[in-house]
Amino acid sequence: MQLNDEQRAMLAGEQGLARQMAIRLVLDLAAAANATKLIPIQSAHLSGVSPLTGGLGLRLFLQKLAQDPLAQVAVPTTLNAAGCDLEQFDLMRIALPDFKAHSEEIVAAYTRLGVRPTQSCTPYEWEDVVVTGHAAWAESNAICFGNSYTGLLTNRESGLSALASALTGYTPSYGLLDEANRHPNLVVIVTTKLSDPTDFSILGDWIGTQRKASWKMPYGPIPLIKGLPADLSHEQKKALTAAAANYGCPLLYLDNAGPRPPAQFEDRLMFGERELQARYEALRPRSAPSLIVIGCPQASVGEIKAVAEQLRGQQVETVPLWVFTSSQNKTIAEKLGLADLIRQSGALLLENTCPEVVPYDPTWVKHILTNSMKAEHYIKSGLNGLPTSVMRLADCVAIATGQVSIRHDQPDVKPAAAPKKSSIVNRQSSILPATASGVETFRGSGLPSQGDFTLTGEAFVTDAPITFLGFVNRDTGVIEEEGHPANGQSMAGKIAIFPKGSGSTVAPYVLLELYYKAVAPLAIVNTELDQQSAPACSLEGIPYAYGFAPELLQTIRSGDWVEIQRRGEQVTIRRLED
């Protein structure tokens, strides 16, 4: 790859340690993706702000960047939602020690880098945020919304890779930045009428749950959705893309919304009234919720207005109701009198935070009700591990005000015994036994920034993707995800072999925390390039290799003693004979 003078200066450290680390990471990702050039970006959006998600790994990494006085972002960069509303912290009743102080520390560290502290997961709703051209955005809902409805072109960046691009001003030219890779690969035909934004949220999430192992979708499912009205509201479109992003959808097309690239369909799905009602039935609360949360992603002005109208003349007395929004939208809501309506009812209107990144106090929050499948997806995960139900907005408000009560037609939820739900659906795989005798060598590639190495160690193997955020214990390296074939097993100190990571774009910070606590894998081997594992490995020198044949996962099994060796650009791995 030919570098320009600016890029060579960054690589040589002439613009400081932070940009040197960042350009190395960008070049590693470029090489891994077979990108032949770097292209300038117009904007960046960073995930990894709440101590709940970024954790110790994020805080220590930001402290490392702070040691460089030249560390500054090179393009307009916005910040994702934080873990609390600092001004209403006491009202949120967060019991996690030092959470407020750590939140302030993280936001201040980003601000020193020149990041605009918007603390919003909806940058596309801000008037002066660039939503056109090449970009490096993390935060899955923002990626899908921007790619689908605006002129933005961004890959599904991790928090670390987006930060590296923000510091350098460049990103590798590959993936969804190439129009040839933005074609729809799945057709979804909707045969029922959808109206409430929650209907669209359920549709988006449902699409992701249908994914099959046979689908060839290197950049995730990109559905073409037919059968929807041509005049969808902002809130309906937002709910659709936010939930579709739960399972890695970076972009979608609406059939009646203008030109699109030629389709290359892998499958055809039908979503009708039966599917919609089945999801509502499965998601409805079986017992009274402890808390109702609205605004995931953060509520637009239209959503705030809808909540305020539902609350007019009512009092929130039965179940606490929290409405989450951005500081920009809250300011507008104050001017329109909507904020007063919400507060007068007894509900909270919170800013700068989002339901999925709050550490709820389990002594009183035992069951959450929401109108968002994005909130449901993450709140029930290992981040909080709370039973989460879903209903339409009007139903949520009616329960909060006591107009509707939950029928006890099934036993009450018991959170202490509730399993952590899997974010990966219909897994049919398991820890695979060895199927070959003797020694077989597999070949892959390594990161350009890492030199030659030879390691031997115990293998940890699974043929299912690993969701680091929420499903890997940060203190032990143990996978804690019911239904995952490696549930209960630790990666710490082992050569971890798996297809790739999945889930949140904040995942690299979990891997960094494992490294800082000395419970990270000895090395990571992926059959596919992993945008979640590779950035952390690049920055801290954890040996990383990718691009191996899938048969590797069938030949080596957990507990085998293996050797991984890098010579030049090639990495080999083999099972050592007993």
Short names for language-model regions:
Residues 1-416, 481, 502, 506:
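Non-transmembrane, aqueous-exposed alpha-helical and coiled segments at domain scale
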Residues 303, 309-383, 438-572:
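Feature captures the catalytic cores and cofactor-binding loops of soluble hydro-lyases/lyases
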Residues 290, 420-422, 493:
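Generic secretory/membrane-interface signal
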Residues 406, 410-437, 578:
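Short, basic, low-complexity termini and linkers enriched in Ser/Thr/Gly/Pro
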